[in-house]
Amino acid sequence: MAKEKFNRTKPHVNIGTIGHVDHGKTTLSAAISAVLSLKGLAEMKDYDNIDNAPEEKERGITIATSHIEYETENRHYAHVDCPGHADYVKNMITGAAQMDGAILVVSAADGPMPQTREHILLSRQVGVPHIVVFLNKQDMVDDQELLELVEVEVRELLSAYEFPGDDTPIVAGSALKALEEAKAGSVGEWGEKVLKLMAEVDAYIPTPVRDTEKSFLMPVEDVFSIAGRGTVVTGRIERGMVKVGDEVEIVGIRATQKTTVTGVEMFRKELDKGEAGDNVGVLLRGTKKEEVERGMVLCKPGSITPHKKFEGEIYVLSKEEGGRHTPFFTNYRPQFYVRTTDVTGSITLPEGVEMVMPGDNVKITVELINSIALELGTKFAIREGGRTVGAGVVSNIIE
């Protein structure tokens, strides 16, 4: 029987493996692809193939990330795995690989470790909405009570960071044993546990809302005035869609303005509607060119509001990555590059943190000199004289 061809009709979900170093994240990633390949739903990827992650640049930061893809009966998955702890931190903060959910890998033989805690905290801060747990290395634990103890610890840890610890699916197994079985050509008892894990992922991690179904938002890149037609604002639609007759708000920098869309164009052609991912020009009724500038956003009324004070989780580039060579302190005033513009802001460090060294990640409070459209999960770069020195994500809006 010929293998089914790739089916675009299955819903697409982005996930990744997280957890402490050497607990088996990469082995599990390899095992999932191997077990599903026996069902004609994936291409088998070797451990080394995943572990030698190519380096990618995201906002001027080099991150090593491996991407694999596979399907279950119900879904198509893109799965990311990072080789080093620092790569996870960078990946989650820059949103290089946006995750709809994560598989937390915990070694049943060791229990939760410092990076287990840190990855759960990061998931909470950067907005990874759902976590499913795989207790790995079950073959190395003879005592059932020990296994149950680790499970309780993991649930308590999840609850401590406001994940529903009691309701989180936890599947025990051995990624290595499943991988060995699959390489020998069969789905055995360990492979079944990997399939059980994927069934839990299918059921527990909801299908994400597609970008086109979200509230319309377009960062303003440029503004022109066209004689006889009015003001055209150009940019790439970040989410949602826009069509002639829609009411929109212009948010950020100055007081929020309301207006109506009188035209949507792409490459000088009229469009019925523009949607997420399109680079468009939007004609606005009665808006003057000088009332709109780069750094504002066009959006569905009421969907996003302007703010100037927020908390963020940031990663500070190391010297080797082209970042600062020296630490910074409270009252450091860099530029925050959000969507299309730089806004100066001052940083306050958390109590007990004297300074931040290049290569650190830390939670900060920022006060900008102008209000701009912000919400939980908004990504930003931190720049100094045009070069990127850090990256971050908004974790809490203060005012």
UniProtKB/Swiss-Prot annotation:
Region (G3): 81-84
One Pfam entry name: GTP_EFTU_D3
Annotated segments matching region G1: 19-26
SUPFAM superfamilies named among the record's database cross-references: EF-Tu/eEF-1alpha/eIF2-gamma C-terminal domain, P-loop containing nucleoside triphosphate hydrolases, Translation proteins
Residue numbers spanned by region G4: 136-139
Region ranges (G5): 174-176
Xref: Gene3D superfamilies: P-loop containing nucleotide triphosphate hydrolases, Translation factors
EC number: 3.6.5.3
CDD domains (alphabetical): EF_Tu, EFTU_II, EFTU_III
Keyword line: Cytoplasm, Elongation factor, GTP-binding, Hydrolase, Magnesium, Metal-binding, Nucleotide-binding, Protein biosynthesis
Region annotation G2: where it falls in the sequence: 60-64
A single Gene Ontology CC term: cytosol
Domain tr-type G stretches: 10-209
Positions contributing to GTP binding: 19-26, 81-85, 136-139
Main location: cytoplasm
Domain of life: Bacteria
Similarity-based family: Belongs to the TRAFAC class translation factor GTPase superfamily. Classic translation factor GTPase family. EF-Tu/EF-1A subfamily.
Subunit structure: Monomer.
Record's protein name: Elongation factor Tu
